[in-house]
Amino acid sequence: MEYKIEHDSMGEVKVPADKYWGAQTERSHENFEIGIGIETMPREITKAFGYLKKAAAIANNALKPEKMTDEKLKAISQACDEVISGSLNDHFPLVVWQTGSGTQSNMNANEVIANRANEIACKKICHPNDDINMSQSSNDTFPTARHISAVAVIEDKLFPAIDTLVATFKKLEKENEGIVKSGRTHLQDAVPISFDQEISGWRTSLERDKEMLSSSLPYLKQLALGGTAVGTGLNAPKGFDVKVAEAVSKLTGKDFITAPNKFHALTSKDELVFAHGAIKALAADMMKIANDVRWLASGPRDGLGEIHIPENEPGSSIMPGKVNPTQCEAVTMVAVQVMGNDSAIGFAASQGNFELNVFMPVIAYNFIQSARLLAEAMLSFNKNCAVGISANKEKMHFNLYNSLMLVTALNPYIGYENAAKTAHKAFDENISLKEACVGLGFLTAEKFDEVFKPEAMAYPHKN
């Protein structure tokens, strides 16, 4: 391998000749061999750095044109566009497990953009610190990159995944309207419910989760950039924070603003805790939905068997013919991961000492992982399971009419205690509720038939 010599304030460093990064990135690459190739800083963060560095150059060009010249701006902008496109991803090797401020990832961006900009300009006009990092600090750039990436992963990944599954559930509601089945509470038989009513509960959970996620976005759209090292804005020109937020908004197509209090923006990560709480709520609902689906599909002979789901692959290496609810299992594992990430994010966010939180990379990594995993799991569940759900009407009807909880319909006519006696007699003697009720002398056979209508129990207020 060929090397080039780069230098920083600590001296010279050998760097692979075919890479755009410089001395500080190489030092980090050598000093933090933790999770190499597995836990690289998320590409969403890299892309966000591309946006914010271009926005910073635009703002500096407007406020300090003698330093950020048009020539520099042009070269930097092109280099940033390449970072945004992902074509320079191979030049961002650093892992999450580095300095807690994200300084080395900020310098990775500065060095790559500077070296690429110099290559574009065909001369050395850009310095990583003096030009690419102009008016900035790692302490305000990393929080900014994290907010940009968080908004993007929610709006561009999670929201479409939610919308897709909601649309599928709406379709299933229409297809299964009026199919009455046994309700269940505590994993025990309960009064009847229609299958479309049950599905509507799933759908509404997801719609509510989207609303909660949406409520977190205004906080995430406040950017720390302009606060520099401790929130005072030292070395940034007046108005830089507003202009850079405007530039980020224009570049991303999302309505970012400058954070009203930069001291809070640097040291507190409560916005991400709040937003991830909504992601955790979505994970909890997906866990519940996946569990409902696999319970309802359990069997094929010894389970509930009330729905059919797609058979995607063999389920056992020893039991021939076995097919498992694998999409449901994947969703539940992702949900567990998200819940673990939430604990990590909450604890890391509590560790902001004085003017800076130095757990920022792990917060960013876990947040993005949660949103990405959950979005992809939901799309996979939709494509390979939800769209193929169908009701086993015969099994639903059989289970409904064998449920002792249908006795609840008799409460207004014979009272709670007599209804309980009826249920116990039916169970103990393995007879029908009608036989038990009539046998106990509570109702005549004719009156029982008049008031006992299981399907109607799912619609008590329907005329």
Predicted regions and their residues:
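Conserved, well-structured ligand/cofactor-binding cores
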Residues: M1-N463
